[in-house]
Amino acid sequence: MKTKVGVLYGGKSPEHQVSLSTAMAVMNAIDPHKFDVIPIYITPEGQWIKGEQLTGPIEEIKQLQFTSAATALIPVSLNQVPAADSAAGGNEETIDVIFPLLHGPNGEDGTVQGLLEILNIPYVGNGVLASAVGMDKVMMKNLFAQAGLRQAKYIAVTKYDWQKRGETVYDRIERELGYPCFVKPANAGSSVGISKCKQRGDLKAAFIEAFQYDRKIIIEEAIVGREIEIGVIGNDEPICSVVGEIVPKKEFYDYEAKYEDGQTELIIPADVTKEQYETIKQMAITAFQVLDLSGLARVDFFLAEDGAVYINEVNTMPGFTPYSMFPLLWQHSGVPYPELIERLIALALERHQEKQTITYTFKKEKR
């Protein structure tokens, strides 16, 4: 009997289009002999819409952008996702596992993971806490610091602080970080809202841009060096892929460079020494464990000119587009695309089974 996989994609997020690209690639790569695939689309407005079970490859992204004429999934019944005729009183179709291919806020940040936990539905990837911390760059870096992982210096600023004490904030940046520096939304991915600042005059526009996507931003010192990434999969015993290097043709690896073909070069495996690889690997495993990650993650690093390794961030749901680093890293590590997806689904079911052994009630014995 095939495993029924509900692929969840889209979302009320700045990274909606990225999610569509990822979903198309993953659904076309899932082994149809082992899995039945049911697409579940979250519109930009937040409506959940279920499509029909796939019977063949998806040719265009627009095929995944369902309208309300398809099966709306709200309201949802606990412990299962309704099939098309459930609202009319027909048979209900239980989905075995959800594969959430959501990027950014309202999807990769623990919100959807929390819903799936309440519904007691197995799902691929990281749990509620890990997803939330993995999305919030400030909290993530605070935990990195506590774990002793080398990273760039950083400052966190809220929109309220900036509006009240803007010049003081700029003074602190110049005093503690200097130029160049990067300004980023604390809760966003895919390089959305990121700016590189070379002087004080660049900061205001960068802050305005970043605050479009979050009420909290992070400013980081620029590390001169190479951008290195590594893939991690697993639960309690995570394993690492080979490392890859990003060589952007633009000044830095922004949204367009990530998702428009030809804007960047990926070198896999990256040219690093054995010692550098071991350092990157161990730092990635430490980050995976410190953030209590499970399933998968891509961990990003800087390799400075002096050979020092700096951890940058983790991505709890890395992209699976044709140009994405994560699946390419595993292909070069001997794990083909369909097998990678199969492993992630198996890890999700394994973690869910473990959770079923936990007792959630407590009765005090009478004396």
Curated annotation (Swiss-Prot):
ATP binds at residues 174-229. GO terms for biological process: cell wall organization; peptidoglycan biosynthetic process; regulation of cell shape. It holds the Pfam family Dala_Dala_lig_N. Residues 141-346 form the ATP-grasp domain. Belongs to the D-alanine--D-alanine ligase family. NCBIfam families: D_ala_D_alaTIGR, PRK01372.1, PRK01966.1-2, PRK01966.1-4. This is D-alanine--D-alanine ligase. It comes from Geobacillus kaustophilus (strain HTA426). The lineage of its organism: Bacteria, Bacillati, Bacillota, Bacilli, Bacillales. The gene is ddl.
